[in-house]
Amino acid sequence: MKLIIATFNIQNKYKLKEYSGIDSYGDHTKELVDFINDNNIDIIGIQELTSNYKKRLLKLINKKYKIVGKYRFTRFFNIFPYTKKYNETNSIITHKKIIKTKTYHLPFFPKTPRIATITYLLLENNIIRVINTHLENRVKKIRDKQLEYIVKLLEKDSISTILIGDFNTTIKDEQFNIFIEKLKKINYKRIDMNNQTHKINKLPIDHIFIPKSWKVNHIESPDLKCKISDHKPIIVEVTI
């Protein structure tokens, strides 16, 4: 069977008092929904989704899609303006049958909490796992620990897994290459896409990993010609 998979950091516009997917450039929630529909996406990992953005997304998106994943701060922290503004989820959006979902906290101290959302899906008679994450952007030592933690998550279960997210690092990073090699040893491969996905970095910091046995039919990182994010999405069609 074929699957269309995507990852997209939709950018929390934190300079606004509250971000619901709308700013002076337009309605980015609607643009995100159009992107999902126009590309017939089966599974997409979204990073930096705020609660107000998610509320509007749930209203606009086709009801066949489900949005799963908890926020990085508990409800208690929502009483504070700072943590409420930065309370994001790494959601997984899919129209496939969801079996279960769990959100894990990655090593993060003393920086802002980082999470990984894990969802098990039923595809015809097969169960697969999807992991969506967003790693530390400033402190390399913390990001390296997060990479190690993700390897452990993958090793915990032999089920075929899609790993997607904003890793905040490129293939020029030695530790990230060690991570790639570790994943190769447990039969995963990085989608070989080296186009720019962030306006500052010339190489992609957003990545998709899939089982080695899956065939890659098509890869793209489209320029959406809108101000939805400072990232570009990655889309890949695979055959399982």
Where are these regions (language model features)?
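Catalytic metal-binding/acid-base residues of hydrolase active sites
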Residues: Q11, L49-T50, K97-I99, H134-E136, ...
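Active site of divalent-metal-dependent phosphoester/diester hydrolases
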Residues: K66-H95, T112-P113, N168-P233
